[in-house]
């Protein structure tokens, strides 16, 4: 078991631990803690040695396996898996400095470019554009306002003139062409001179020989020559030559005869123009465009005037009305007053008829509305209390004892103590006097009218109607907020227990009133 790394036999321990390290028990007595520490030290040393041996064995196995693979590859034999006799441990990883790998130089694709190359190309293009852009002298020609330059750029050249140094501004230095650019500018000037074309020059003799000089030498307007040449001829529209207006205004010479009627240019020569009849009948009017309706406004002779037609705008004719003319401010005549009176009466009669119709319509509407409304009449209802007088009325809530259920609420209303009218005297203000009650004058039937009656609110349904007898007992129970009155009531010949809940003041007042009536009934 030499190959077993975990073998902890005594022979191995004796080899690893020297003889002098373990003292004898006879010389030194060890305590329990020292013994445990010593044994732990032995175990750690044994395990460290086993680890070193296993690492050496695994390295030797790897070397032998690599040598066998090389031999087999040289001989051309197929590799066979060899079963491992022992399990090797994984060797420890040795960390070493990484090798610097040199990247291979590869040709990048023109489509795939790095971000730095794109930025570099963009900067180069911007520099080219800035170099090509001419420096503008005027501030208005620049795209952006001129920024302040640092002081070191404001240095200017000094020029000696007359023994003194003058500072030349930087703008003049920039605008001044360099020595290399001067020959180019001179060449461009020579080329521009050669390309110039001689322009024709004018002279006074050439203008005098032209046809326009005649108009310039004459004192009259150039268009006056045409008027002078046409003197003595008839006008284009057939008017006499003496008329200056081509539209046939009245001639200054009244003795000039009007022109004859124009002839048609086609057809027979003797046929006159159909438009000549309008112009030929107008005496003294030579306008070709004279309207036949103008005579009605101007009073001149025209074709319509000869036919007897008159215009509505004839001057001198007064306006015609139904009434006779009278001077301004004159009093009105009696006839006019009578006419106006008749008209006023007619208007009044019409207005009166309209008012009567309106009144009739209103009455009809009112009658219809009255028919629609319900006519409510006061109806007398006999509640059976007409011959009785109420001595006391208090508000209470009634409870009735039901078999198998207990107290059951029947309703709430006014609890009244009624007696016949003939048994009570009435004081001033129709208020009965309870002390004046005398049951001696009552018969047996009237005595039954001394009773307790109660009606439910809103519906007025009778929920209690019992006579008061001398033998009845009324028991009052006072509580914190209210009081109850317990008694026996008679309904349909049956006796039922009734409980009335009311305020303490009302309970006291009710019990006092009932006790007085019981006493008087018992005495009678």
Swiss-Prot record:
InterPro entries on file: PH-like_dom_sf, Ran_bind_dom, RanBP1-like
Biased composition (Basic and acidic residues): 28-80, 114-168, 179-199
Name listed for the protein in its UniProt record: Nucleoporin NUP56
UniProt cross-references to PROSITE patterns, sorted A to Z: RANBD1
Main localization (coarse): nucleus
Compositional bias segments (type: Acidic residues): 332-345, 352-362
Domain remark text: Contains FG repeats. FG repeats are interaction sites for karyopherins (importins, exportins) and form probably an affinity gradient, guiding the transport proteins unidirectionally with their cargo through the NPC. FG repeat regions are highly flexible and lack ordered secondary structure. The overall conservation of FG repeats regarding exact sequence, spacing, and repeat unit length is limited. FG repeat types and their physico-chemical environment change across the NPC from the nucleoplasmic to the cytoplasmic side.
One Gene Ontology term, aspect cellular component: nuclear membrane
Function noted in UniProt: Functions as a component of the nuclear pore complex (NPC). NPC components, collectively referred to as nucleoporins (NUPs), can play the role of both NPC structural components and of docking or interaction partners for transiently associated nuclear transport factors. Active directional transport is assured by both, a Phe-Gly (FG) repeat affinity gradient for these transport factors across the NPC and a transport cofactor concentration gradient across the nuclear envelope (GSP1 and GSP2 GTPases associated predominantly with GTP in the nucleus, with GDP in the cytoplasm).
GO biological process: intracellular transport; mRNA transport; protein transport
Native source species: Chaetomium thermophilum (strain DSM 1495 / CBS 144.50 / IMI 039719)
Stretches assigned to the RanBD1 domain: 377-475
Keyword terms: Coiled coil, Membrane, mRNA transport, Nuclear pore complex, Nucleus, Protein transport, Repeat, Translocation, Transport
Motif Nuclear localization signal in this chain: 37-44
Membrane topology, from the record: Peripheral membrane protein
